[in-house]
């Protein structure tokens, strides 16, 4: 039974090699499918090697007979294949041996491991003309770096707007114009109140006071009234100045708000053009037709480039 099992495994390996040799002369997609089949056969062969070695060790310990029949079945006659195919398939043989080596190295962790990078390299080597034909530069598509730069610019502008709005909302930027306007208004109101609270006339009875003393008191009250009049004028001027500053600040804030709203709307419109849908619309450089490029195709182009 052990000899029969070993002969069966070696026959499977021979069939895989035969499929590999027979698929060398196939052009185009058939060569690609043949290469993938050869890789899968090599993977199965590599997966069956540890079991075969264990059974061979037990067989040698039990009966030291030479497995001549299995060696005869496992050896492949080179005369059965034409020499041209042998010479043309040397590069792909080495690549498939690399696949088998990778499979044998990864058997300890995974049983169904296939190195996709090596398969992609084999496919790129086998069909360079197809790859050159499908190059995105020939189709007239724009460089994807332009899209990335536009997206980065829009994101940077949005981040700057967010940081400025956060700074103003958190109170880090002090508005000195508003503070000065409030101070002017408060000072003007206080001056007007003080000028009307302080009495201007003399409250002393003229019958109890001498004439010269009464004249002196009247002069002092007149001087005080003049100062109070100046305080009223200064208070009114400060109130007017504070009102003008507040109105200017209000107009400036409305103008800045309108500019911010327009910039925000423009940036959101650009971001909607870039990220609003699953399809990018790009104009070709040769004609005015539009091409729709999905996200999956964009990733494929990035991998190929």
UniProtKB/Swiss-Prot annotation:
Annotated GO biological processes are: general adaptation syndrome, behavioral process; macroautophagy
Q: Which InterPro entries match?
A: TMEM74-like
Molecular function in Gene Ontology: transmembrane transporter binding
Membrane-crossing residue ranges in chain numbering:
178-198, 232-252
The listed locations are: Lysosome membrane; Cytoplasmic vesicle, Autophagosome membrane
Whether Transmembrane helix counts among this entry's keywords is: yes
Q: What membrane topology is annotated for this entry?
A: Multi-pass membrane protein
- Name the domain of life this protein comes from: Eukaryota
Keyword annotations from UniProtKB, A to Z: Autophagy, Cytoplasmic vesicle, Lysosome, Membrane, Transmembrane, Transmembrane helix
- The main location is membrane
A GO CC term attached to the entry:
cytoplasmic vesicle
Extent of Low complexity compositional bias: 58-78
Record's family?
Belongs to the TMEM74 family.
Q: Which PANTHER family match?
A: TRANSMEMBRANE PROTEIN 74 (PTHR16125:SF3)
Q: What is the name of the protein in this document?
A: Transmembrane protein 74
Q: Which organism is it from?
A: Homo sapiens
Primary gene name: TMEM74
